[in-house]
A protein has these predicted regions:
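Conserved acidic donor-binding segment of nucleotide-sugar-dependent glycosyltransferases
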Residues: 293-304, 312-317
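Nucleotide-activated donor-binding/catalytic signature segment of Leloir-type glycosyltransferases, i.e.
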Residues: 218-243
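Short His-centered aromatic/hydrophobic patch
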Residues: 86-91, 106
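Acidic donor-binding loop of glycosyltransferase active sites
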Residues: 250-264, 277
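Short alpha-helical donor nucleotide-sugar binding micro-motif in glycosyltransferases
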Residues: 239, 247-252
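Conserved donor-binding/catalytic core segment of Leloir-type glycosyltransferases
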Residues: 6, 132, 165-183, 187-196, ...
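N-terminal strand-loop element at the rim of the active site
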Residues: 9-17, 25-64, 92, 212
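Carbohydrate-associated surface elements
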Residues: 137, 157
Length: 360
């Protein structure tokens, strides 16, 4: 049975081509033809998945959170969905569950989210609606200090058809992502500065900016990093569209994901594996689960760890090739076909769950 589904994006997420973050890209990838996607207004072309309708946010001097919630309710009353899917906003999901069946998809640690900070709040959410996390790590964080809960895992996915064909590998080490301290980008620059003189035939590239989109601001962190990167011989490209990043991953011999932040999934690592690069990730959050045995682990701040892993790979072409093949096989487990089949199943579960839960 085809369900009418309204998908609600987080307030800061843009559903526009060239400006979309990870959540919007995933929503577009998985969207069914009849899905309606809603969120903040955009001025550029919307992403192709589903049908995007901007929220009409009230001009009244009310808290932004309240105005966003009321706009979502108005959109739900207009569309009359069988199910509302809310991404990363537990408080909004609980509010909307009073009016329609809701499925909450968590992309980050819920312990820092409004409406899910305490075990009691998370318990209440799990009793009222179907909660899904993008990784085992997220589900464990949601269940922490709670009684028995029913929480599903809905892993992120990739469109394998969008992955560029295998190309000759350049002797390049690539970092791709947000250029912020949490992502360990300064550790990458430090590591490269330490070892570059031993590898004159190799180059290092840093793709990304503080946030997604071409109008990303210059930040104090970036201002400090630029001269360090220049001195280390790391080429900084600034923000690049998603397709360009995939092209770079398909050419780079090595991709590093040196996050300090406990990555709730690790999309960059998954995409790098799909592109056939040899990958190095931090042993934090969901990253070890996502890569399995198809990547090397190295802590960004452990003395010599990242440098050692890079040298290990740059010294051994056979190991790079082996990890590249393992990575492609691992990434195939996260393909779109499997993800869409699971999505339809979870949607039906969410509607059935809502019918069986008591609404006060």
């Amino acid at each position: 049975v085809s369900l009418r589904v309204l998908t609600v994006l987080p307030p800061r997420e843009s559903y526009a081509e060239g400006h979309a973050g990870a959540i919007a890209l995933l929503v577009s990838r998985l969207a069914q033809p009849g899905d309606r996607i809603t969120g903040k207004a955009i001025t550029d072309v919307p992403l192709p998945g589903g049908s995007f309708v901007p929220l009409e946010i009230s001009g009244w001097p009310l808290p932004q959170r309240l105005k966003y919630g009321m706009a979502c309710l108005s959109e739900a009353r207009d569309f009359k969905p069988d199910l509302i899917e809310v991404h990363n906003r537990p408080d909004l999901a609980l509010f909307l569950s009073r009016f329609a069946p809701v499925r909450l998809i968590l992309h980050n640690d819920p312990g820092s989210m409004r409406g899910a900070k305490t075990p009691a709040q998370r318990q209440r959410l799990a009793e009222r609606l179907l909660v899904c996390g993008v990784s085992r790590w997220v589900v464990e964080r949601f269940s922490d200090r709670c009684g028995p809960l029913s929480v599903a895992i809905q892993p992120n996915c990739i469109t394998l058809e969008d992955i560029p064909e295998v190309r000759p590998r350049r002797q390049t080490v690539l970092f791709a992502g947000r250029v912020v301290a949490d992502k360990g980008v300064d550790a990458f620059v430090r590591a490269w500065a330490t070892i570059r003189s031993c590898y004159p035939g190799w180059t290092a590239t840093l793709m990304g900016a503080d946030r997604f989109g071409p109008d990303s601001p210059e930040t104090p962190f970036l201002a400090r990093l630029r001269p360090e990167a220049e001195k280390a011989g790391v080429f900084m490209t600034g923000y690049q569209p998603h397709a360009r990043i995939l092209d770079a991953m398909a050419e780079a011999a090595i991709v590093v994901v040196p996050s300090r932040w406990s990555e709730p999934f690790g999309m960059t690592a998954l995409e790098a594996m799909a592109c056939g690069a040899a990958v190095i990730v931090s042993p934090v959050g969901a990253l070890p689960d996502v890569v399995g045995s198809a990547a090397l682990l190295a802590s960004p701040d452990a003395p010599g760890a990242l440098e050692g892993a890079l040298c290990h790979l740059m010294d051994q072409a056979a190991l790079r090739s082996e990890l590249g093949q393992k990575g492609r096989e691992r990434a195939a487990m996260f393909g779109l076909e499997q993800a869409r089949a699971q999505l339809l199943e979870l949607r039906q579960q969410a509607v059935s769950f809502s019918r069986g839960s008591a609404v006060p």
